[in-house]
Structure formats: structure tokens, C-alpha cells
Amino acid sequence: MTARDTATLDFYAAEAQAYAGRSREAEHARIAAFAAALPPGARVLELGCGGGHDSVALLDSGLDLVATDGSPELAEQASRRLGRPVGVLLFEDIDATEAFDGVWANACLLHVPRAALPGILARIHRALKQGGLFYASFKAGTAEGRDRFGRYFNYPSPDWLRSAYGPEDWQSLDLREEIGGGYDGEPTPWLHVTAIKGTAVKGVAVKRP
């Protein structure tokens, strides 16, 4: 099954400049913790970089960043912000093997159709080195659907998301639930997942603070 949604990509193509240009704070605290858990100069793949807001903070943390987005239009906007090339990469085209110390996927895998998400997580798992760190965030819910802009969201529950990660071997997986915002400006429940690639645990349980 394809991991892309045409209507969602069409939205980002049409709104790329406005989306990238909006006032948005990078996830500084999470990025700092992410970078601190990696070796100096760690090679990190960023998925769904959008306008490049997090990319700036990741680069400032001293990481060897490979920033990408599935939307050519957003990749161009991010490239302008960063002053360096940003790759166009659809999730279903991730084909690296043990190439990255970390993967940063903030607010992007939430657009992957539910049926396709376990396969995409498997691709990310394969792209990570042993002991590699993987961060992703999702808008929480109980059933997949679309927002008022027509964008698709998988809206997982914590238990559903755990099952999506479960088929792969993760040394640890930490899931935290928080209220945050979004492009529509509305308060939104979010799931923040940090996982470490390893073979010690299979079908790991979700940890809660």
C-alpha cells in the first residue's frame, strides 16, 4: 500500500510558502535531548522537515543532518531557510540500511495511512544503525480522518501506535502524551515517541511518565 496521500501532498504544494513562513518555534527542548543522546556529529535523517524550523535547531546542535520532505515545494522552502539543499523523499522510498545514528520525524508520519505505517516504521528501523535513536510525533485520536484543510491524519491511540511499532525490534520505546498546537491553531492531543533500535526487546511496552 502506498504511504502517500494525494490530497495532503496537494495541500502542501499549494500552501508551501504560507506553511513554511508561519511563526513556529522549533522543538528546542526535545531536539536538545535528542542531540545529547547521540554521539558528536551524529548522522541524522530528518523526515518531513516542512519549512525547516526544526532543521535549523538540529544543525545548531552539531548534528550531521540530512533534511528531507516528501513535498518538493516544502523542500524548496526549507532549502531557502537553511541555505543548503534539502532532499525530496517520500516515506515509501526510504531504502537505507544502517546508515543513520538517528531519525527525526516530527509531525510528519501522522500523514501515513494506518495500513501503511508499520511498513514505514520498518523502513526507518532498517535505516538506523544498532542503538540508533528515533523520534516521531503524532496527533492522537481513535480513528483516521481528515482535518478542515483536507489533510489526512492517522490519529492513533497510544495502544494502536504501540502495536504499529511492535513488529520491529526496539531496545526501548517511550511514549508521552501532551497537549500541543497545530497549523489550525487549535489545542491538540499529541503522542511523542522515542525509540532505540536494538534486539533486546521485541514488541516493547509503552512507558508513561
Predicted features along the sequence, with ranges:
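Conserved class I S-adenosyl-L-methionine
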Residues: M1-G50
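Class I SAM-dependent methyltransferase SAM/SAH-binding core
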Residues: G51-D93
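A short acidic, Gly/Pro-enriched loop at the edge of an enzyme's catalytic core
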Residues: E92-V103
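A short glycine-rich, Lys/Arg-flanked "PGG" loop and its adjoining helix->strand segment in the class I
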Residues: P118-Q130
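Core SAM-dependent methyltransferase catalytic element
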Residues: G182-P209
